């Protein structure tokens, strides 16, 4: 397992994109997409030799994420990429992690399955077994493109 990204919950995804780009020199690598299952807007940001950042903004009736943001938002989860999602879920459950969201299509990952687990100390874990990102506008290996779409 290796870290794919870390995720931050924000109130306004476009403002957050501007902030991460101007302060931390990240680049938007995917268009903002609407994830109807998780009821969030999603985008990924990248920076050479750094970890990928995922930003999520609550949409629709996502009351739990809206409540999270009222309390300040911020760090939401760490995502690990594994070789076999079902097998890794079973392994982590045997080690005491609690399954929060069973495998379901993740629109931010071109509908490949994702799952969420809860580790000790309230750490939310997302699991994926794909490299695909929906709405790719900037390859994570290519930097300096100005053709962003928000």
Task: Give, region by region, the residue ranges found by the protein language model.
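Core segments of cupin and vicinal oxygen chelate
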Residues: 8-51, 88, 94-97, 102-110, ...
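Structural preference for solvent-exposed beta-strand-turn elements
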Residues: 26, 105-112, 121, 128-131, ...
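Short, conserved turn/kink motifs that form compact alpha/beta structural patches or helix kinks used as
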Residues: 58-61
């Amino acid at each position: 397992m290796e870290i794919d990204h870390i995720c931050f919950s924000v109130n306004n995804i476009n403002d957050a994109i501007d902030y991460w780009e101007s302060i931390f020199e990240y680049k938007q690598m995917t268009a903002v997409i609407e994830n109807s299952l998780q009821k969030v807007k999603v985008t990924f940001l990248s920076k050479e030799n750094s970890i990928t950042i995922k930003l999520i903004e609550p949409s629709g009736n996502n009351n739990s994420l809206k409540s999270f943001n009222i309390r300040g938002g911020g760090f939401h989860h760490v995502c690990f990429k594994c070789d076999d999602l079902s097998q890794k879920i079973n392994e982590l459950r045997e080690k005491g992690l609690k399954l929060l969201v069973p495998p379901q299509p993740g629109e931010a990952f071109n509908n490949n399955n994702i799952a969420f687990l809860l580790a000790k100390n309230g750490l939310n874990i997302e699991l994926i077994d794909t490299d695909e990102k929906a709405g790719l506008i900037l390859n994570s290996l290519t930097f300096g493109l100005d053709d962003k779409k928000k």
